[in-house]
């Protein structure tokens, strides 16, 4: 189907505001830009929100814990924000974590992992894996259920969720109930049909992705590592079930769907859901109808996995 009218209007607004893509900005300006992009007035209320720092082998790691209403122990969603491993933080994805907490009736733990270029790969997946281990070990004290832990994220956060799921399989722990991969980055390559078709004009561009990867990796060879490019993993051990969500007008569409098929081939119960007429980032764009449908699908998948 053609690009949706709401999406056209959103892109026109961005173009009218000027500023160019992330690839034309300094890292500092790009970090400010994502806060504006996903800014939500009056985000949903949850039962409680707590910021804390947790000890890891690489130092203290900031996290934010969102607790839903109702009696625990609550299932846990470990959430890793998008932003090309370079931008984004607890604030940029605060509204997204709130709606997921309420819709899926789960405790959401958002991880403020170390960003590139100050901290290159594998700092981000290492932090996300350490945070997930910590959450499982400390779930009872938090009011969470260590037997019902999922990972999820959008874009580069979806990449990190996929990486943590791979790490958990490779290392034998923790056991994960679900992986929620929202238009994930899965391969350090720019050769898919969707990258050619949607490489410019739809919010995220091919040039942006090159810029993000260049900041994230020490060198191109590092992009062949499966925890950087999950699509290149030779073996997938005990893959968790999950949902891979993609957008029709997204350069990352095909690599996300290819990874979903790879997980299916490895025996995982994976739903691949392409949203027609919409663009990269739509899960955080609350003005789009696609966001509401996607939130409902994500929540349904999480709740079903947590009920098993």
Label for each model-derived stretch:
Residues 2-25, 32-308:
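Alpha/beta-hydrolase superfamily serine-hydrolase fold, recognizing
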